Amino acid sequence: MKQKEHIERHIATHTVHSAEDRSAVSFLESVLNPGGRICTSFSSDDKWSNHDGFFEYVSNPDISKSPKQNFIVQIKGTHNFSEKNGVVSYCLKSLSFPAFIAKEVTADPGILFVVLNPDIREGQRIFWKAMSKSFLSDIDFEKESKIIKFSPEDEIKNTDESIELFCEKLNGIIDTHLFLNKLNSDDLEQEDALNIIEYQCNEISCFIEDLHDSPQYRDEVSRRIVRDLNDLCYATLILNAYKNGYTNVSEKLAWEVSQLRVDTRYLCNFLRGLKYINRRIPKEGQAERLMLKYYNYLWEIRRFMRENYNKSILENLEKFPLDLDTVDSEYYEKVAKQIENIDLTKRNVRVSRYYVHKITPFFVNGERYYEITLQLAGVYSTKYNRVTVYSKMTITTYYSIQIAYTETELELWGIRNNIKVLNDWKVAIDPTCLNKLSKMLMKHTKINRNYQEYVNLMEFLTETGMNLFELINMRKERFSQIYNRVFGTTNTHDFGDVLIQIRREYSKSSCKVGKNTIGYAMLHMRDEILEDLLPNKFYPKRISEKLFVSSRCYPFEKNPMIANLVGTKTSKKDKESIIELLDDSKVVSLVQPYMTIDNLISETGELLFKKSEIGSDAVIENYNTSLDDWERDKGYFIIEKEGLVTIASYYDTTINILKRLLQLTHNVSLDRQEENERFIKNCGIKFDDIDKKIALKHLFVNSNIMLIYGAAGTGKTTLINYISRMFGNARKLYLTKTHTALQNVIRSLDKNIDNCDFEIIDSITRSNSAVIHDIVFIDECSTIDNRTMELLLGKISNDALIVMSGDIYQIESIDFGNWFFYAKDIVKAKGASIELSSTWRTEKEELKGLWKAVREKSTIVTEMLSMEGPFSENLGENIFHLDEDEVVLCLNYDGKFGLNNMNQYFQNANTNSKAFSWEEWSYKIGDRIIFTNTRRSTLLYNNLKGTIINISYAKKSIIFEIEVKAFLTEC
């Protein structure tokens, strides 16, 4: 008899309630009445044959009385139970209710309530179980009864706190239920799944064959392939569950099973992505992008079928064009050969921790390999100390890891270079991060890497690829299993208690303030992120009395889709994590108009857009209506101006800043012009650029502001020096966004300029004092966001003179900042704005001309490259023959031709010294170096070049003697 038939035979046509059952119904109705959130419709007679009615659950009756979900229930009363070590055992003698839910006669989730001693006053106790997919799969429907074990977590006490906790768990059940409802609930036989895979793979292979003959149609063919991927993923999920010993497998069960192993989580992620696409057709050019991502999943499915079912599928997958150039192919073929020829036996991992920055799969002769860029974790982490490793295994975690690797030689361009091949890796979250997460919950822990609970937790995260956020949102049965596995045999469970508290109070289903911040922290567990979330002396306010979390996290709590978490750029750069946090496609769809405008502003630099590009009136109105008073006050709503739409805060701050700047251009001072001309005549400066001389002549004559635009090397700092000398007796304030930039300003100023103060912009904007200086210099203006600039201008008096410098093509601000871009075209008063265009970092006129053409987006750039050069040559061994002061520019920091890897090639080309090793890095005498910060000394400034002339080892350190060409004596 099949499982389906076993289930059906339990579904009853008639039931009889005992006196205990009727007492249980009555008592349960009296308890479940938490302020209108649960509306019961129970029956104590034989009204329904397989269940005892239902209740409507209202998530937040203060906002809406509309039920969020109905729950079907069975209510049993009993005196027959046993209790041992806090666990209550009860025998459910009829399986009609679980069978009724398993058969899915109802679309609503089911809950079994068991009331102990229902007719004994003050002795009643309520326990409950959700009829989840995994709970039902554990029931043997060939039998007539089931022993159910209730833990203390399953008890509902007659207190407000316990009822509130029950309601939060109902929210969690609803979230899981809504996603599972998108999945197919019908069982699929193993043979049927095999047939689906064979059919879909034959279709995909035909598409790839067509594409191989006509590669220009890659996007069009990719659309057809993407359309067929849902069934392929579905069938593979089913086969994976059968392989792991499950029977009667549905898509719902198969999806849950795929989450529990690191080597099958790709199926879970694949399905989530396909369900997000659903029946929509990707826009032009986007299917191609999806296929480049899904290519790796298809390779995984092919391997899965070959290893587990001895089936050959997608044999022509390698014919799908991945657009690798010749140098890429040559390099990756050599890497693959080295990986295949070395011993990959697992080794002990090294001490250093890394974050995975980027994973790039590549394919050679039908085999898949990975190029993995790792970022050193910790306070000394920079983009300059990333490490590239190669592997046949991927790394499946957001968290910091420790690695073991083998070095092997690879020759390219006549240079033998060591590459790192991964032997093993493990999750290794810095214990201080666990302690800081505990601190956020007002708990004090001192976990270190020697704690057995830490060791067990890291092993679990490594084996499963799961993250802590997923863990605390698992269904109760699964969470209990994992918790017992990790913490069941340890002497301590300090962090286990933290996880239980977070699961109880701040899971997805929670309505408490702080859940988004804590959820994001759990997803990433990085010290630099966690530190910003804590209150400090500048921002001591907390978001809640129950959390040690900064009040600056409040916008992110309100709406993480549109507000950045403090210190990050989550709303723009980490949409994936935010979508995982919310797990609600309706919320994502609701904020789509805002996100569309935000993206368009970032892409185009424009501020106003046609409404038709954003959405219908109804879509925009729905978004605006969803905002509360606080969000509207902060300007998150969308406004319309003459048929064009934009985001209110972006528009208002832009207009306010530009109005203030224009007000400062209405001052005329003829005396100032005379003073300027006198300075130019007597200063003794030999002007190398006539533009600077003209700027000084008209400085502050018609305006109280001076905007200086120009790329690096055009002399912005030189002009600021001239202005500082001109106002020698005035009180001067120099402001920058970062400490590094401020040190650069201090270093570049003439030492004989007096009356100078230097500050970080944030220290001014968060102080209660106004700026009292005569002239204010603001550097790197393109990195200052609108809100900060609006606050800063409010601190500066109308009488002060302001010099603002920057490059609009430079690094953008973390938050929205377009004011400096628009000011270039708005501020037109004579002498109020200058763009420096002459570069002083090359003497080659041809290169200067090309540089100017590129900056101006000239239509003849291609012609100049062809006729005026050569400006470039093919990458090869000539790159290692450097002139004395030559610098090689790399387009990025990562991968085979990124800055870090190219530095290693240059080092290996240095044959004048042996290598001195220190942790994962090697150094040679004669290596050229560059200082990237002023942490060691303000004299060793950012971008100062030097050469290593001696290296020696001390007991616990390495010592470098470095030759630099700089004045190291402070006046």
Named regions from a protein language model:
Residues 930-971:
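Conserved helicase C-terminal RecA-like lobe
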Residues 186-405:
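Extended low-complexity, intrinsically disordered and solenoidal helical-scaffold regions
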Residues 697-864:
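ASCE P-loop NTPase helicase motor core
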Residues 303, 309-671:
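N-terminal accessory nucleic-acid engagement/regulatory domains that precede
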Residues 683-704:
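N-terminal pre-P-loop "Q-motif" helix
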Residues 1-49, 55-188:
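Mixed-charge (Asp/Glu-Lys/Arg
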Residues 81-85, 121-129, 137-138, 742-745, ...:
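Switch/connector loops and helix/strand junctions flanking conserved nucleotide-binding motifs
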Residues 694-696, 703, 808-938, 947-949:
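Conserved helicase motor core of P-loop NTPases
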